[in-house]
């Protein structure tokens, strides 16, 4: 047998070998891209007018008018806040041949619209939004059903197909009523049938609707099985996947459209979710949580997703209902972040324009967020929002879960909330907001970025890259290292700290915060604000985005508080990863030829000023599947170009050419198969 055939046989035998484990916080795909309410759906028209009013008042610095809805302690309807009563019908449906659902419709009335939460829960859909809005929004409704559709479940979920497998985040062939056009059509046919079955019982004119279009604001649908988003865990669970959407064409009800003779109200915008789920959203014996419908209702007010819709980071993670906070504790979702609340007029926004000492209470009780603007040029409209998040009200579950750090067996000592410092980039929000692609926190600049006190940047790390926790570069959805001073007791945020107050525009922020102190446990915070006085600095965070062994890498270093005529040099101490260099224009690029953690210092000069900063770059080993290696070595051209070949050569015989010896070495090193005659070359390389 030839050496080539020997290695080929070893490769094929190794196909069944396990892949290397990845140390990352477990993730589950949830939201369905491309499915949405109409542009004018739910209360988006009203919310758009509120945002325009608030933007004008903010630009004019008319804070008394901006904060008028909450100024007296009693909610006051105003053009500067989303307010009123949102009346929502909920329709429960099941399928032909399906056993009777576990919970009666009265249980759903209690979970969604009750004043007193049932089942020992802290909130209903109604009470959660009442507290979140400080009484400005009253969610009311009624539940109808269960009604039984005429066909089995398989008639409405779209069955299975290879087309659905290409779209399904689990890689399953399940269509879940959503992963192909045909499946979505089948699902919507089921929703229309459910509406027809309850139409005689429901007077849709008693629920919220747009008087200008005759469209009911929102309808909730509940189906009897666990949601498809819970995954095909032990078998083919081809159930409908929770999502928001709109019926096209809309369903014409039997109820007249008031003021429009001969015309009738329509149903278009809806939220579909499972009627089951419990505290983790996927427990089949417990009634549904409220996290999904609470999150989707936020979209009904025009708020964007604040997780990273490109799946390259966690975005804001669990720290906001519009991030992953709806799943932090689905029975008690996280509050909205200060920026989202300010968009709706549900928080008092206090500007800080002078240096000094300030204090404020926990967010749910103080209803206050501080606004801090840069002191100099600000072409992107950047600013900072400060809020005090403690284990109070809805944030109790948030802080408890954040304290259960995913990479530790026990809760850290002194675990509590603290000050959250948000960096807002208005240009990013305007160009990539909910009505412009819903990509606020996708890409190199995030519209709303949480400056994480522990300097690990877990929210900003790519969750798809392997790492060893709790190091920087390990992705999670937020932990108690993020607030100030937090478990790391970090009292300072400034241009020279990690993280820092650097602006995305490169302009000088002139903002520093120090002496951040928790005055009362789960209560008041105090800090000192210092405005102005910044000099030339390297603005790039010291812990760089992780690189991969042999893969192309490029990162542009940033400076601030200079004229912009920057000249870069380095390293002048330590050593960058071999294969990477710093250009005079500040680009760190190349392809690392080794793994490890590398610490080195760079400098930037602007006229007579020079600033230096020590940087750390972690180079990790890529994770390749056996099929990817087969594709590279034997089954045709490599889909990913030269990066994978370069990596395999470096970990192999490092002779500058990708060959069978490299594949043999990879097999031996990773345990995916024995490679006869392979010679290990491990000196200076990750074992």
Residue map of PLM features:
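Active-site-proximal segments of metallohydrolase catalytic domains
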Residues: 69-80, 127-263
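Proline-enriched interdomain boundary motifs that mark the N-terminal boundary
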Residues: 534-542
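Short glycine/proline-centered coil/turn motifs in the loop regions
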Residues: 560-564, 574, 607
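Strand-loop-strand motifs at the edges of beta-sheets in extracellular beta-sandwich domains
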Residues: 576-593, 647-648
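Cellulosome-associated attachment modules in secreted, modular CAZymes
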Residues: 616-687
């Amino acid at each position: 047998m030839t050496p080539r055939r020997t290695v080929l046989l070893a490769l094929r035998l190794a196909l069944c070998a396990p892949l290397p484990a990845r140390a990352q916080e477990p993730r589950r795909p949830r939201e369905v891209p491309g499915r949405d309410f109409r542009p004018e759906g739910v209360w988006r028209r009203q919310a758009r007018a509120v945002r325009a009013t608030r933007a004008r008042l903010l630009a004019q610095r008319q804070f008394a008018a901006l904060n008028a809805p909450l100024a007296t302690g009693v909610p006051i309807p105003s053009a500067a806040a989303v307010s009123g009563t949102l009346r929502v019908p909920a329709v429960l449906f099941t399928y032909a041949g399906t056993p009777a659902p576990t919970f009666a419709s009265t249980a759903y009335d209690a979970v969604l619209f009750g004043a007193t939460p049932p089942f020992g829960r802290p909130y209903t859909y109604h009470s959660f939004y009442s507290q979140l809005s400080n009484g400005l929004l009253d969610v009311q409704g009624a539940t109808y059903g269960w009604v039984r559709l005429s066909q089995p479940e398989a008639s409405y979920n779209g069955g299975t197909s290879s087309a659905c497998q290409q779209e399904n985040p689990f890689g399953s062939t399940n269509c879940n009523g959503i992963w192909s056009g045909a499946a979505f059509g089948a699902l919507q046919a089921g929703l229309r049938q459910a509406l027809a079955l309850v139409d005689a019982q429901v007077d849709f004119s008693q629920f919220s609707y747009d008087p200008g279009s005759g469209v009911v604001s929102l309808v909730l649908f509940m189906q009897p099985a666990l949601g498809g988003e819970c995954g095909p865990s032990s078998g083919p669970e081809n159930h409908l996947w929770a999502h928001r959407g709109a019926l096209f064409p809309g369903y014409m009800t039997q109820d007249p459209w008031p003021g429009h003779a001969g015309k009738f109200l329509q149903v278009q915008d809806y939220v579909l979710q499972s009627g089951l789920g419990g505290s983790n959203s996927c427990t089949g014996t417990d009634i549904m949580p409220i996290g999904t419908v609470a999150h989707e209702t936020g979209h009904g007010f025009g708020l964007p997703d604040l997780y990273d819709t490109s799946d390259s980071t966690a975005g804001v993670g669990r720290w906001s209902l519009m991030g992953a906070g709806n799943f932090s504790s689905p029975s008690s979702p996280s509050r909205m972040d200060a920026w989202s609340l300010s968009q709706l007029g549900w928080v008092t926004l206090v500007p800080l324009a002078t240096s000094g000492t300030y204090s404020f209470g926990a967010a749910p009780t103080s209803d206050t967020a501080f606004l801090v603007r840069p002191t100099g040029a600000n072409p992107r409209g950047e600013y900072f929002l400060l809020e005090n998040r403690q284990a109070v009200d809805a944030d109790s579950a948030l802080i408890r879960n954040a304290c259960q750090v995913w990479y530790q067996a026990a809760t850290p000592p002194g675990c509590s909330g603290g000050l959250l410092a948000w960096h807002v980039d208005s240009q990013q929000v305007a160009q990539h907001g909910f009505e412009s692609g819903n990509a606020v926190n996708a890409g190199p600049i995030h519209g709303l970025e949480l400056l994480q006190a522990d300097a690990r940047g877990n929210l900003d790390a790519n969750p798809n890259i392997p790492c060893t926790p709790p190091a920087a570069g390990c992705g999670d959805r937020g932990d108690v290292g993020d607030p100030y001073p937090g478990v790391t007791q970090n009292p300072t945020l400034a241009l020279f700290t990690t993280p820092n107050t650097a602006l995305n525009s490169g302009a000088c922020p002139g903002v520093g915060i120090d002496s951040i102190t928790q005055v009362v446990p789960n209560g008041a915070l105090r800090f000192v604000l210092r405005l102005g006085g910044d000099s030339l600095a390297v603005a790039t965070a010291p812990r760089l985005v992780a690189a991969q062994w042999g893969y192309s890498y490029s990162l542009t270093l940033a400076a601030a508080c200079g004229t912009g005529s920057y000249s870069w040099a380095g390293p002048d101490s330590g050593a960058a990863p071999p294969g990477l260099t710093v250009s005079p224009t500040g680009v760190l690029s190349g392809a690392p030829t080794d793994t490890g953690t590398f610490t080195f210092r760079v400098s930037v000069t602007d006229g007579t000023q020079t600033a230096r900063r020590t940087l750390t770059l972690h180079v990790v080993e890529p994770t390749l599947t056996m099929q990817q290696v087969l594709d590279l070595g034997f089954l045709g051209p490599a889909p990913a170009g030269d990066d994978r070949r370069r990596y395999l050569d470096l970990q192999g015989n490092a002779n500058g050419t990708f060959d069978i010896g490299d594949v043999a070495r990879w097999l031996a090193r990773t345990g995916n198969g024995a490679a006869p005659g392979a010679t290990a070359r491990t000196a200076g390389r990750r074992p």
